[in-house]
């Protein structure tokens, strides 16, 4: 009996010791893992680079937004502030706040620009601390080290909770929990990148319900991550994006096609029909409001009239700013100055700026369907300066609702409005108003707004080809894009923030254009006058960078006097907080522009 009791006592002592040893080993392993993680944190930069290299093909849309983001908002990550003249050496990385990864067609389920733009949050652009989590992380019970610490009766009495807890209910994360969480996220991304790289072509397919493995929790986590700005495999097989290094990928993809390096293809343009403005004739016009209608394109032998009357400055806000001038001026002919060549559409927009009223018939396009006849007739009868434009907009909406019975018909209506808006820049503002009224019109689950934003997104991805093949359509697309941003609003009254970076990209490319310089600068100037205030409210850092480029271009000796005058007016308007300039300053720019285009 004594031997058996001694044996049982020794076995109990051995088991208790082994228990203590196991707990000690778990305790040591947890801290060893912590210090290993600390050592791996130093390799985060290299990990970002490896993750970047794995993304060999990205969408054209996200790649093209790299330069405005890389060069504007570097201090969003707590880095050095940008230089005064807009140095382009800084870069922006919207860590965890990448709206483009959530709104491109490469993201989960083929989401496009119309991913509820009113719900996009821009507040995290300005987070100063890179690794500060949105919410404090709870304390982690490391491998059950706290197990068995409380005996029966030692728990907290909930009735006396106020006596137990301190006055401040918050808690601080442990020293390295933020870094550990970030590193775990980085490990998961690198693991997913390696798996994606090892898959055969065509293997990047979303998991079907029939292929679910027992580990469905991980599959659900991947889906949840894609809704939070992460990524899921795209049906087309293209690699997906992560928010933490999206902008570096944009920059990497954009280095292949510098904006200014268009080659010789830009010299052959189908739609560039230029003519010199000669012998302007003066025509008195009656005062009108809104965007005035424009002439139909004239042949190069036709004389281009220049306006003699301009509206007085209006109050700030809205796309009516660019039509704010009224001044009687006699053009002066300067024989020694070289003649400035503008596109026909640019001359039309300049006449609209100078408020010349030309009521001309609009050519009716041949409808593909009989139901479209009346809609196109109403659409072509709309004039920007007519007093009954709102009535015609309402008539068009009612007719569209009555005749639209399928998704194809709705798509045809959107396509008709879009084609007219990008081909006739004078109609862009009216088209944007019409689109705003019909934004929530839905047929078979498809919204008018979704189809419109998809068309804008498609043209944005091929804008370089548009610039080389059809410069008129390129300028018309940029004009309509800015008008949509300045006019359309979400259901909560907010502008479509998803359009902010595309507009900045297009405006920067207008300033960098080496071919139709005056036309591009004129387009950039007029769009900044109409939407500059709203753009700066959404993303002021990129406006600072854009205006720095405008100053550099204005000081370049090779630029024409018209270019310098237009850019100087924009810079002065920005210095006046986008409020209308005083009448003497407005008259000065009016005379200068009229002399330079005479």
Swiss-Prot record:
Keywords: Acetylation, Cytoplasm, Nonsense-mediated mRNA decay, Phosphoprotein, Translation regulation. Residues 43-55, 258-272, 321-336 have a biased composition (Basic and acidic residues). The modification Phosphothreonine is found at residue 289. The modification N-acetylmethionine is found at residue 1. Residues 376-577 form the MIF4G domain. The modification Phosphoserine is found at residues 18, 299. Widely expressed. Pfam families: MIF4G (PF02854). Residues 56-75 have a biased composition (Polar residues). Residues 1-18 have a biased composition (Low complexity). Coiled coil: none annotated. The keyword 4Fe-4S does not apply. GO terms for cellular component: cytosol; perinuclear region of cytoplasm. Residues 1-305 are annotated as: Interaction with NCBP1/CBP80. One of its GO terms (molecular function) is RNA binding. It is found in: Cytoplasm, Perinuclear region. GO terms for biological process: nuclear-transcribed mRNA catabolic process, nonsense-mediated decay; regulation of translational initiation. Residues 1-20, 43-90, 180-336 are annotated as: Disordered. InterPro entries: ARM-type_fold (IPR016024), MIF4G-like_typ-3 (IPR003890), mRNA_TranslReg/HistoneTransl (IPR051367). Its main location: cytoplasm. Specifically required for the pioneer round of mRNA translation mediated by the cap-binding complex (CBC), that takes place during or right after mRNA export via the nuclear pore complex (NPC). Acts via its interaction with the NCBP1/CBP80 component of the CBC complex and recruits the 40S small subunit of the ribosome via eIF3. In contrast, it is not involved in steady state translation, that takes place when the CBC complex is replaced by cytoplasmic cap-binding protein eIF4E. PANTHER family: CBP80_20-DEPENDENT TRANSLATION INITIATION FACTOR (PTHR23254:SF16), EIF4G DOMAIN PROTEIN (PTHR23254). Belongs to the CTIF family. Interacts with NCBP1/CBP80; the interaction is direct. Associates with the eukaryotic translation initiation factor 3 (eIF-3) complex. This is CBP80/20-dependent translation initiation factor.
């Amino acid at each position: 009996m004594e031997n058996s009791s001694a044996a049982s006592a020794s076995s109990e002592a051995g088991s208790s010791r082994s228990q203590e040893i196991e707990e000690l080993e778990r305790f040591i392993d947890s801290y060893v893992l912590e210090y290993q993680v600390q050592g791996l944190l130093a390799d985060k930069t290299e990990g970002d680079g490896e993750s970047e290299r794995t993304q060999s093909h990205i969408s054209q849309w996200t790649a093209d937004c790299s330069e405005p983001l890389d060069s504007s908002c570097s201090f969003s990550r707590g880095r050095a502030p940008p230089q005064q003249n807009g140095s382009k050496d800084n870069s922006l990385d919207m860590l965890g706040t990448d709206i483009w990864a959530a709104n491109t067609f490469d993201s989960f389920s083929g989401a496009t620009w119309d991913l509820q733009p009113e719900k996009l949050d821009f507040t995290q652009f300005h987070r100063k601390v890179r690794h500060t989590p949105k919410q404090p992380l709870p304390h982690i019970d490391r491998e059950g080290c706290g197990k068995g610490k409380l005996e029966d009766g030692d728990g907290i009495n909930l009735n006396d909770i106020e006596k137990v807890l301190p006055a401040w209910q918050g808690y601080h994360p442990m020293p390295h929990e933020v870094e550990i969480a970030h590193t775990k996220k980085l490990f998961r991304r690198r693991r997913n990148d390696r798996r994606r790289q090892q898959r055969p072509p065509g293997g990047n397919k979303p998991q079907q319900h029939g292929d679910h493995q027992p580990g469905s929790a991980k599959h659900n986590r991947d889906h949840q991550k894609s809704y939070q700005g992460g990524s899921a495999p795209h049906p087309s097989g293209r690699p997906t994006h992560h928010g933490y290094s999206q902008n570096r990928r944009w920059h990497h993809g954009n280095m292949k096609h510098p904006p200014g390096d268009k080659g010789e293809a830009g010299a052959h343009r189908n739609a560039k029909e230029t003519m010199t403005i000669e012998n302007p004739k003066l025509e008195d016009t009656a005062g009108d409001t809104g965007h005035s209608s424009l002439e139909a394109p004239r042949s190069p032998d036709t004389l281009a009239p220049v306006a003699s009357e301009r509206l007085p400055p209006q109050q700030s806000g809205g796309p009516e700013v660019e039509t704010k001038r009224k001044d009687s001026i006699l053009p002066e002919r300067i024989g020694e100055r070289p003649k400035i060549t503008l596109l026909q559409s640019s001359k039309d927009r300049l006449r609209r700026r100078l408020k010349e009223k030309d009521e001309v018939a609009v050519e009716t396009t041949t409808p593909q369907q009989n139901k479209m006849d009346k809609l196109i007739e109403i659409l072509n009868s709309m004039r920007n300066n007519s007093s009954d434009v709102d009535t015609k907009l309402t008539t068009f909406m009612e007719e569209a609702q009555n005749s639209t019975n399928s998704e194809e018909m709705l798509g045809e209506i959107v396509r008709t409005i879009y084609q007219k808006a990008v081909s006739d820049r004078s109609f862009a503002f009216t088209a944007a108003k019409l689109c705003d009224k019909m934004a929530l019109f839905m047929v078979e689950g498809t919204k008018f707004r979704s189809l419109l934003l998809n068309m804008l997104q498609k043209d944005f991805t091929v804008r370089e080809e548009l610039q080389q093949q059809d410069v008129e359509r390129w300028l018309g697309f940029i004009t309509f894009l800015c008008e949509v941003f300045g006019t359309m609003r979400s259901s909560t009254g907010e502008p479509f923030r998803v359009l902010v970076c595309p507009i900045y990209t297009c405006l920067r490319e207008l300033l960098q254009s080496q071919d139709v310089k005056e036309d591009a600068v004129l387009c950039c100037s007029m769009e900044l006058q109409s939407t500059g205030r709203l753009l700066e409210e959404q993303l002021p850092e990129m406006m600072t960078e854009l205006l720095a480029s405008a100053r550099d271009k204005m000081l370049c000796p090779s630029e024409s006097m018209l270019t310098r005058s237009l850019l100087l007016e924009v810079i002065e308007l920005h210095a006046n907080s986008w409020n209308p300039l005083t009448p003497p300053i407005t008259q000065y720019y009016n005379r200068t522009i009229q002399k330079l285009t005479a």
